[in-house]
């Protein structure tokens, strides 16, 4: 869907857009190497997670021409700091001191008019199979023929692409932004933007989200507070709901991207803070109240109706309510034999079903469950000093009636 939107966007320009997907006749690796070997220069996104860092590093090493990676991930550039940060507060304080130059350094809205010449692939450089691929109408592609996991169903209530992302952003700004800091705790009235998958796939940028919000509130960079305290509130001098959203888009999102960039082992138990590993190892021998397998988790077959509902939402919709996503992950830690097993299960479920999976932000969420970016709390069985969450406290904190009706036992996985 994103490719279809791109094809439409590029059609009036001099850019020859090739939707890149694997077929039996044209393996992705062969296609990319052929293009690189015919290129004058290669420009690609920099993305610090999943298999992409290794793939792009290898391509850069073997490329016969200049190979550039562009960091357009977040408002605060990954290269602007030579270290990662262990807490959101420490990173927030750092960016409050140093982000000013980047608040006016946004991408050009439409750079395409600068391209003066069009390009048409021909048989001199490409095989007939590739030429057929290049001229393929992506709108007629039969997705069932692609080598992907077809047990994961398509999401019916949302589509990909920039147009859809922009509609969601405008709708959110008109209906959800002004209560973002309050209703985030309501499962029945989720005010979240729903844009995380679109950010992940590059269908919209954090820059556009932030810039549109600034325009809406007639804000400019000169309005920030003069003192960097690391506080989540009152630094932007915007209404509380807007500051809460900016903290998610800039502080938490960029924190995760920078962490993955500086720590290639970001998805492993070994990458966790020492205090977290020590306390969990101290409690490895604790009796778990329940033990579930990956299959039981995947099929929402636990004793907990709230956990099961969250898992059903993930499988059916590719997303999960933000607060329940934290509880969901905490309970996997609670109901497995080791933290390593919990990480493996969380990574599998998140990467398989979440539309925003395989992303630094989602890895931040998984590993926060086990202590990353957090501090030590009161010691408990199994968790040790890892932050503890329960379904009972969630019931008291959140409105769940409609949510449980929507994703209850009759909602099959």
What are these regions (language model features)?
Residues 35-36, 110-111, 173-175, 288-291:
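A short alpha-helix capping/helix-coil boundary motif
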Residues 77, 84-270, 402-413:
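Glycine/tryptophan-enriched, flexible segments
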Residues 22-25, 162, 188, 303:
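A conditional alpha-helix N-cap/helix-loop micro-motif detector
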Residues 186, 190-404, 409-410:
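Active-site-proximal binding-pocket segments
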Residues 1-113, 312, 334-336, 340-341, ...:
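Trp/Phe/Arg-rich N-terminal binding region typifying the photolyase-homology
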Residues 2, 51, 161-164, 302, ...:
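Soluble or luminal CAZymes and related metallo-dependent hydrolases
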Residues 45, 70-72, 94, 172, ...:
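Structured loops at beta-to-helix junctions and adjacent beta-edge loops in soluble globular domains
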Residues 43-44, 183, 298-299:
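A generic structural signal for short
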